[in-house]
Amino acid sequence: MQKSIYIILIACLTLIASPTNVKAQQVIGLNEAIKTALKNSYDIQLVENSLAIAKNNNDLGVAGALPTVSATANDNKTNSTLQQQYTDPTRNTTKSGVDGTNVTAGLTASVVIFNGYRIMATKDRLAALEKQNRSLLEAQLQNTTSLVMQQYFNVIRQQAYLKTIEKSIEASTQRLDIVKTKQQIGVANEADLLQSNLDLNALLQAKQNQLLIIDQAKADLLNTMVLPTSTLITIQDTITIDAKLKLAEVEAKMKLNPTLQSAEQLININQFIEKETRALTYPTLRANTGYNFTSSQSAAGFSLLNENYGPFVGINLSVPLYAGGASKKSIKNAQINTSRAKIQYQSAEQDMSTALYKTFQTYQNNLQQTPIEIANYSMSQSLLQLVLQKYQLGQATMVDVKQAQQSFETAGFRLISLRYTAKIAEIELKRLSNQLTF
C-alpha cells in the first residue's frame, strides 16, 4: 500500500514538471532567447533613443556653421495731432485726428566667418557624442546578451539539479523496496522502514522545491526577454563550454570593450569642450546681408508718403575684452573635466583588467577540475548501485547506502556547479573582450 502511495506521489510530481501540463509549452533555444531579448529590451530602446538624439544633433546647423536667415514685418496704424510751424506764420498748421501708417519689412541673413574655431570644435564634439552613444548601445547589447545567456544556463543548471534529485529518489525508492522485502522475511526492523520513508519524503520535498526554483529561474529569463512571466517555456539544452580561450587574447581584445571605448570617447568630448570654451576668448567676425523695406504714410503734414527699400551688406566684429575672469575659470573647469575623464578611463581599465584576470582564473580552474569531477560522478553512480546490491544481499548497512547516496548527490551537484561556473566565466570573458555574438 505504501509503495503504491509513493508511486502516485512521484507520478504527480512528474506530471507537474511535464512540459505538456495544462498548456503546451514552447521549446526555446539560446539564439531565440537572445534575439527576443534584444528586440524587446526596454534598456536597449532607451539607449537607442539617446543615440537617435545624438545622431540628430550631429549636424552643421546645430554646430552653427550654416547661415541663419530671419524675416521681420511690422504694420503700425496711428491717429495723432499734427502741429507744424514755419517762418511764415500763415503756413502754420494744427490738425487733430491725422491717420498714419508705418510699414517695415526685412529679410536678414547672417553667417559666422570666424569665432576662434568654435564651430569646428562643436561639430567634432557632436560627432564624438554620437560615437559614444553608439558604443553605449553596443555595451547594452553585450550586457543584455550576457544576462540572457546567464539566465538561460541557470535554468539548465537547475534542471540538471532536478535530474540528480530524481535519480536519488529512484535509489531511495529501491532502498525502500529492499527494506520492505527484508521486513517480510524478518531481517529488517520497523526503524529501517521508517527511516527509508523519511529519506524518500525528504527527497520528494526537495524535488518540489527544485521545481519552484526552476519556475523562478524561467521567470527571470522571461523578464529579461520582456515576455509575460506566465509564458510556458521548455529548455532542452546542455551546458557546453568553449575551452579554447587564452588569457593573452582576451586581454588584447579588452580594448574593444564598448564600455571602455565609451570612457575613452568621453575624454575626447571633454577635450573638444576645452576648445569650445577657449574659443570664447577670440573675436567673432560675422557677415550680414539682407533686404529692408520701410513705408510711412500720413493724411496730413509735410510728407504724405516716405518709402525706403533695398539690399544691404555688412560685417560685424565682436571682440571680448573683459568678462570678470569668467572665461579663464571656464577654461580651467573644462581642463579639470578632461583630467577627470582620463582618471575615470584609467580606473575603468584597471577594474576591467582585474575582473578579466580573476574571471579567467575561475574559468581555467573549473575547466581543470571538470574531468576529475566527471570521474567522481561516474564512480559515485557505480558505488551507489554496488552498495544497493550489497544491501539487498545483507552485505551492507543502511548507513552505507545513505553515505553512497549522499556521495552521489554531492558529486552530481558539484559537477553541475563546475560546468555552470565555467560557462558563466566564459560568457563574462567574452563580454569583457567584446566577443559575444548576437
Language-model-detected regions and their locations in the chain:
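Terminal intrinsically disordered/low-complexity segments used for targeting and assembly
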Residues: 1-36, 86-89, 211-249, 430-438
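Bacterial Sec-pathway N-terminal export signals of envelope proteins
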Residues: 22-70, 74, 229-271, 320-321, ...
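Short segments within alpha-helical structural elements
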Residues: 205-227, 378-435
